[in-house]
Each structure stands twice: as C-alpha cells, then as structure tokens.
Amino acid sequence: MPSHFKSKHGVIGRSNMELFMVFTDLRNLTSMIPANEKSLEKVSFDADFDNLRISANGININVRITERVPYSKIVVDSVDSPIKFTVTLNFLDMGGHRTEFFIELDAELNFLMKQMLGKKIENGLDTIIDTLEKQSAQI
C-alpha cells in the first residue's frame, strides 16, 4: 500500500491556467533551478516536454507526465526509478488571478523508509508551496 503525503494548500497569485501552463512542460522546471545553488552542484537535470531525469551521486530519478486535466490537475509518475511514486499537482481556480495549489505524493515506501523520510517529504512539499506563494507575490 503506497504512503500518501499531502502539502499544505497555498494561494498563488496567478490564474489556474497560467500556473498549469508552467508545470505542464517539464522543461520549465529546469529553468527554475537557481544556477548558484550549492546543494545542487552535483545534480544534473535533463527534461523534455513530458519527461524529467534527475541524476545525483549515481542515482537516477526519471518521471513522466501521465495525465493532464487542463487547468486543474497534472499527474507525474516515476519511470525506472529506485522508488515507485506518483505526484499529483492540483490547481483550484479562486478567480481574480488566484489559484489554490497543493501537491499530493503517493510513494511505495516500506515502514522504515516512511518513518525516516515521511516528515522530510511533507516539509519539502510545503517548502515548494511556500516558495511559489512568495514568488507569485513578488511578480
């Protein structure tokens, strides 16, 4: 049974269409990574429209967009990765160029891995929401 993780809900200062269009092309994600981020120096990213490959320390994580529901949901599944997982990005239109956004992650983690990583995964998902909220407020 997969472990389910869910981020907090954030309000992003963009329409659901604008936000959806950013995430619907995985090449956009590679351009969002800060070039001077020290913690990512030894990590490589390669993307096309539907696929993203992340390599670090001999570990490869490959993902593919498997479902797009225009302006409301994008589903991304792992492909040939050490851990099987699914990420769902949810976009809820609030009107007035505002979108309620949250992320869900379902991962095949054993009990020990869930205990070790569960809180870190939730914190990571919440950090993504916080970052998007801050960035949208500055634009």
Indicate where each model-derived feature is located.
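Beta-strand/loop substructures that line and gate deep hydrophobic ligand-binding cavities in soluble
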Residues: 79-130
